[in-house]
């Protein structure tokens, strides 16, 4: 290790010398070297104290000096194996002769010369032998171990500790107590003695006796450390120090706790659970919280408004905030008058809001500006046309709706007018969608609406009556006026629309127009043939009889009505039908009532908006603009609009989006209140519930199905429609039906190809229909299947027990005689005693003599074995009966 240190020392000196030369400090270094050489000569003449001590030690040893001198060259040769061996191969006398010369630090003089570098190493090596013999020969001398040469150069020599000066007590420097502060602190805060472990190889610390003044007589370093520990209050630990005298006044610690709680009696609190009390009683000191008194508001100082303006709907909490009241005060006032509300309930009645304002002396005005903005227009189409400048109005085509009972020939009559064959393509030979056509006739263009005649499509008929100008009431001449015919008449009268009666099927032999006239007169529609004002035309859809006369009557009615519209205005109309197309997305058939609809215009419906991307007529021809009374199929909608929804053209798509977002936000506000509450009556009555999910091709079909299902009344089964939407049955629909245990009903729609395997794996029941009354009948059957069948017991025969035979293998065998009817094996049996039923079970074995038989008739004896019953007695009656299950009715 010493060789390595010496080598490092040499390298360090060489590097320092090179840096010195590069910095241009050679001349300064030479002057310093000359000055150092002169000092070295003087020091060589006068030996140092260290050399004297070494000589004394060598003289005292028993070994001769020659042996020590012989040992030094060996150690020198053993330590130094330098780069140039020739310089160290001299004799002992030569090496000793170099010692006084090399102590004068010749390194700065000869930087580039390698020989003086080795002489410097020789000097270092010559000093080391002086130390080691002393440490080995005189181990008992209290001489401090000498540091190696490298450490001598890097570290300063330790300064000899000065003797501690005695403290002179000056009375003027004492405090008011007459004692020095050191005495007070030393006595009051005496650190406890700590056991110090003596580690092998480390310096041993011995206790030093204190002097007369009471100060510990330690060395300078130890005294300084102890003084810092005693006099520094920050290093003190109150818990570890000795107990203070309770009689003396504490001058330093402001957290004195005279009363110590017993640790064994301390309760376990939440702070102990989280480890906050581990430090003991002293460490749990916390700063006392500053008490802040609550602010008491003087109600008299609050100025409540006497007039406010709000918009409906509004919650009870918001209304109370506007009136500077507490919500509890408003709720209390409502409760006193029999109205139960909570904080988040919504007030949508203007009367209730005005009543609250009257009770608290505040006038409340309702702001309708936001509703007007969302409504777009409060005027109807007719009012809008009447308010338009007459110079802008032009004559438009009449909108004619064909209405009547199912199978009375409405669609066939329209096909004859249009010269088409729509009726042949309809499922079940009935119309289940509303169709809109624009056909050219000899008397002009006519827009025709074909409405369904089935009872389920009453909403479609009502919608057709609202949008049309003339109603053609189709009545079959061989059947007369039916239920749906009367309903269509009511819709037409409610809309104040002109009615033209077409008595169809006049080519049939049992056609009787007089019967139709009589029925019309009974419902206040007196025909012209009987002197009334109702126009009647006998027609035949198959032969074409009366069609031209019917068209003339329609043209005459249109002239009388003076139908006009403004084609320059923004388009406004009604949704006839809507559906989800596979490639086009949501599409809608709309009828324009006023204005003109163009490509790229933005539309607003009730629940959705859109921008017209494409527009087609009934012949699938692309159109760029559609005027009044023209039905078109449009695409580019955000969602499927509901049939019958009005639409308006707005400035741009952003405006349309903002209007719909505002409407949806208002609808979400009522979502919680509109949720269906659980029917506790059905729960108490233990009613069954049928859950349905409806998928249809168009929105009108969904309306018809939902309306028909709601008309199914049952005291035993409730029907709950979970979802109803337009489109094919998808995978998500099947998963939802499986999770909710619902039945999927598809009307005029199919199942997606990748969703079909999921139906079998999840076990979901899916029913597809193309005719609506087939769907209604199937739903009724499903409702009936949910009901448990009614069990009926039908008596077959009876037998009397005459004898009882005991068997260790099968138990009791009853010997009986059949008194009535037939006793049949494996049928149910009742055991009666004194006309009281004791047991019901199964007749497991029936024998006649020793043979097993299936049945035994009246008057014959038999052996009967009952399954699981051995307590029958002689004289008991066994009644045989059969259980028959009957399905319940809705």
Curated annotation (Swiss-Prot):
Localization annotation: Cytoplasm
Ranges of residues in domain tr-type G: 395-564
Keywords: Cytoplasm, GTP-binding, Initiation factor, Nucleotide-binding, Protein biosynthesis
Region: G3, residue numbers: 450-453
Domain of life: Bacteria
GO CC terms, sorted: cytosol
Region (G2), start-end ranges: 429-433
Chain intervals with Acidic residues compositional bias: 114-128
Name of one Pfam family that matches: EF-G_D2
Spans annotated as G4: 504-507
UniProt region (G5), positions on chain: 540-542
Record keyword Nucleotide-binding present: yes
CDD domains: IF2_eIF5B, IF2_mtIF2_II, mtIF2_IVc
Biased segments, Low complexity type: 55-72
Region Disordered: start-end pairs: 31-164, 189-266
Listed GO MF terms: GTP binding; GTPase activity; translation initiation factor activity
Region (G1): 404-411
Annotated GTP binding sites: 404-411, 450-454, 504-507
Biased composition (Basic and acidic residues): 42-54, 149-163, 242-266
Cited function: One of the essential components for the initiation of protein synthesis. Protects formylmethionyl-tRNA from spontaneous hydrolysis and promotes its binding to the 30S ribosomal subunits. Also involved in the hydrolysis of GTP during the formation of the 70S ribosomal complex.
Sequence similarity: Belongs to the TRAFAC class translation factor GTPase superfamily. Classic translation factor GTPase family. IF-2 subfamily.
Protein name as annotated: Translation initiation factor IF-2
Lineage, top ranks: Bacteria, Pseudomonadati, Chlamydiota, Chlamydiia, Chlamydiales
